[in-house]
Amino acid sequence: MAENLTKWGHPHTFVTQAFPDAFTSLEDTFDIIATDVPCSGEGMFRKDEQAREEWSPAAVISCAERQRDILTAVWPALKEGGFCVYSTCTFNREENEDLVIWACTTLGAELVEIPTDAAWHISGDTTGRNLPVYHFFPHRTEGEGLFLALLRKKTQDVGESLLGGDTFLSSKWEKTQGSRAAKGKKRGNTPSAKPNATLLSWLHNAEDFIFQCSEAGVWTAVPTAFVGIREQLAQVAPLLIGGIEIAEEKGKKLVPQHALAISISASDSAFPRVEISRELALAYLHREAITLPLEAPRGYVVLTYRGIALGFANNLGNRANNLYPNEWRLRNL
């Protein structure tokens, strides 16, 4: 996810890595939460032999319990009136229809109907209750199988029943929720720092950011409008992305970072842009050694293909250092 969102190039994105209960304390924070929950994987049976071998009725029960735990953990962080997308890649009612009914009776959620077209061949409730839920079966739609329901947080006390029935909280959640919260270490933020003119010139809208420099000398630009939510997230979970990583200090030099090259906030005039061929672009993305055209400027340049920024290279003349992230390189051409 961190790689994909960095490639997207939008500065207003943060990526964390934590258990769901890390977010319980962020009450009424998010407008939308998407929960692509772990499941028994019946939608993977056609293409994954291991998924078939690992399936059992006990696995379905265990997955449903985990799904309830996840929704219970993140529900307080959803704003009143906010939406929660619940999805699985399985077919059974225990993890799908029964689970969202549980969310309504226990969490005070309500199911929201999503407009669809009959031409899409999406199937509805399989339990005869006419619930506004959506099955994407592999014999009717493209893909291996998907279930989706849209939940809305009612503006009333959690636990009030909308569909009738008793409230439920799994014993597993009761045992682990408190212990994880107690053991969780608060993570502070890197203090804001004053960037020099060079750093400021690398963003076309630098006045919309604050700048932070880590102990390792990595400079990050954080959109001013999102500093508050970034600080909240950093207090409960490690941040894999917390803004645009724009430069790393190496001695007295500033080495531009890959995220800057592909950010929509990067200044087009900060670094020369060199358009390259398809063959050279593939070699670059494969992180091979490359040589740029003789007329290419020396130093750090942004390589582009069909006008789209691919990343940085340091052009030395007789060769160019390929600065594409090693962990992102194309494995197969």
Give residue ranges: language-model regions.
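S-adenosyl-L-methionine
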Residues: 1-28, 35
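Conserved beta-strand signature within the Rossmann-like core of class I S-adenosyl-L-methionine
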Residues: 83-88
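Conserved Class I S-adenosyl-L-methionine
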Residues: 97-119
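Residue-level signal for inorganic ion chemistry
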Residues: 1, 33, 82, 103, ...
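Helix-to-beta-strand junctions that scaffold the AdoMet/dcAdoMet cofactor pocket
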Residues: 78-80
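Class I S-adenosyl-L-methionine
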Residues: 113-141
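Polybasic, low-complexity RNA-engagement segments
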Residues: 144, 154-333
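Mobile active-site "lid"/loop adjacent to the S-adenosyl-L-methionine
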Residues: 31-72, 89-96, 118-121
